[in-house]
């Protein structure tokens, strides 16, 4: 009896840009052979707003409120790297207290970023309950931000060249400690609900595997890189801010699949609480911003009416000129390495302001790891990458 031969042709389908699982306005042109994915072409740019060109027509002080719109789930990281670039280019010192406050804010943002990743990712694979839990904890972080900066989710506009915009208000430190005490048991609750759930583990284990060599060759960073067996964290590597003052570990996994990326992020939330507690305990006194506006055109010291004087101002002036030179600054955001390549030419505007977004680079490997996967696994693999289209498109 002869076997019946069936011949199928590849089918091309569009996912997005208006799709609840695309995590923004991302369009995927997916080529399928039955249930198997043959090819996938991401189409980006729907949220492009010309952020780099805007930066080149604004002073650094004027541009800080804009940057929260890149990765609108991690505005503090955007602000930090934006002010770090001219600080390092112009050799501006940041007071110790301001550096500690920055670390506290950055680690709160890392927790908020991972929470906002966790809820939709679990909803993508069919677990709805934790989706509502994560917003409960994020609201507490937003309350802390509102008390310190006046705003909740984006546009905190808190970081300044040489420090931060305002000191922590009375009682804020106690509220932050209360949040840390409250949040750690909640992470244990997530683990009980999710990590040890056999249905969840079977659903994502072995999906979207990225080897150590692939992760390095594709330029991945953040949890995507650490989940593939590379123990690389810019907080340890570049020694920026005051992370060297604290005792903390870099968490990593070897399997490189969706489950490994989940485990890295869960453990990073615990580690962020550990860093915040140490920063609060050792929070020094002193100014919260650099009180010497010593990078004005006159230089560090000038003569005026035959007197030597040191110009003291409350803040770095809005007309602060970026010295001639070029510099690349990077920090470890919740998604990976976010960097700024800045070129100054003794003007108040940067000559070039290049943004290196972590999720834009991490998204490049998506078609590669999707080949041969089932179409039902597409959304789970995409969710494990953690992208925000405002940051991808800029």
From Swiss-Prot:
Q: Name one GO biological process term.
A: photosynthesis, light reaction
Which EC number(s) does UniProt give? 7.1.1.-
Q: Does the keyword Transmembrane helix apply?
A: no
Q: What is its main location?
A: membrane
- Localization per record: Cellular thylakoid membrane
Q: Which InterPro entries match?
A: NADH_Q_OxRdtase_suD (IPR001135), NADH_UbQ_OxRdtase_49kDa_CS (IPR014029), NDH1_su_D/H (IPR022885), NiFe-Hase_large (IPR029014)
The UniProt entry's GO CC annotations, sorted and at most eight, read:
plasma membrane-derived thylakoid membrane
PROSITE patterns found in the cross-reference section = COMPLEX1_49K
Pfam families recorded for this chain? Complex1_49kDa
Query: What's the catalysed reaction?
Result: a plastoquinone + NADH + (n+1) H(+)(in) = a plastoquinol + NAD(+) + n H(+)(out); a plastoquinone + NADPH + (n+1) H(+)(in) = a plastoquinol + NADP(+) + n H(+)(out)
A GO molecular-function annotation: quinone binding
Give the record's membrane topology: Peripheral membrane protein
Keywords of the record: Membrane, NAD, NADP, Plastoquinone, Quinone, Thylakoid, Translocase, Transport
Q: Report which superkingdom the organism of origin falls in.
A: Bacteria
PANTHER family named among the record's database cross-references: NADH DEHYDROGENASE [UBIQUINONE] IRON-SULFUR PROTEIN 2, MITOCHONDRIAL, NADH-UBIQUINONE OXIDOREDUCTASE 49 KDA SUBUNIT
Member of which family?
A: Belongs to the complex I 49 kDa subunit family.
**Subunit structure, briefly?**
NDH-1 can be composed of about 15 different subunits; different subcomplexes with different compositions have been identified which probably have different functions.
Q: What does this protein do?
A: NDH-1 shuttles electrons from an unknown electron donor, via FMN and iron-sulfur (Fe-S) centers, to quinones in the respiratory and/or the photosynthetic chain. The immediate electron acceptor for the enzyme in this species is believed to be plastoquinone. Couples the redox reaction to proton translocation, and thus conserves the redox energy in a proton gradient. Cyanobacterial NDH-1 also plays a role in inorganic carbon-concentration.
Specify the protein name. Answer: NAD(P)H-quinone oxidoreductase subunit H
Species annotation: Trichodesmium erythraeum (strain IMS101)
């Amino acid at each position: 009896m002869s076997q019946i031969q069936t011949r199928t042709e590849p089918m091309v389908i569009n996912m997005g840009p208006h799709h609840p699982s695309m995590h923004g306005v991302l369009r995927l042109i997916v080529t399928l052979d039955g249930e198997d994915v043959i090819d996938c072409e991401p189409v980006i740019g729907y949220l492009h707003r010309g952020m780099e060109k805007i930066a080149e027509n604004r002073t650094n002080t004027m541009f800080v409120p804009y940057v929260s719109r890149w990765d609108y789930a991690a505005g503090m990281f955007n602000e930090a790297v934006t002010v770090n670039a001219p600080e390092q280019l112009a050799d501006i010192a940041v007071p110790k207290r301001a550096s500690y406050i920055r670390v506290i804010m950055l680690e709160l943002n890392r927790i908020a970023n991972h929470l906002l990743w966790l809820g939709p990712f679990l909803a993508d694979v069919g677990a709805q309950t934790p989706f509502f839990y994560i917003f409960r904890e994020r609201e507490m972080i937003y309350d802390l931000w509102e008390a310190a900066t006046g705003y909740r989710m984006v546009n905190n506009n808190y970081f300044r060249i040489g420090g931060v915009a305002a000191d922590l208000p009375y009682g804020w430190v106690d509220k932050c400690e209360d949040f840390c005490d409250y949040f750690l048991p909640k992470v244990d609750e997530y683990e009980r609900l999710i990590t040890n759930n056999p249905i969840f583990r079977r659903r994502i284990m072995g999906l979207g595997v990225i080897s150590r060599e692939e992760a390095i060759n594709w330029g991945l960073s953040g949890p995507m890189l650490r989940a593939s067996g590379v123990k690389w964290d810019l907080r340890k590597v570049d020694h920026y801010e005051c992370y060297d003052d604290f005792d903390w570990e870099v968490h990593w996994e070897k399997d490189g699949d969706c489950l490994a990326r989940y485990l890295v992020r869960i453990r990073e939330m615990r580690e962020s609480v550990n860093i915040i507690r140490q920063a609060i305990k050792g929070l020094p006194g002193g100014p919260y911003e650099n009180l010497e506006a010593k990078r004005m055109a006159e230089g560090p010291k000038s003569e005026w009416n035959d007197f030597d004087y040191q110009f003291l101002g409350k803040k770095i002036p809005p007309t602060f000129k970026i010295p001639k030179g070029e510099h690349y600054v990077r920090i470890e955001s919740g998604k990976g390495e976010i960097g700024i390549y800045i070129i100054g030419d003794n003007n108040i505007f940067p000559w070039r302001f290049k943004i290196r977004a972590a999720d834009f680079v991490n998204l490049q490997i998506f078609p590669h790891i999707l080949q041969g996967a089932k179409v039902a696994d597409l959304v789970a693999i995409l969710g494990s990458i953690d992208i925000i289209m405002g940051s991808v498109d800029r």
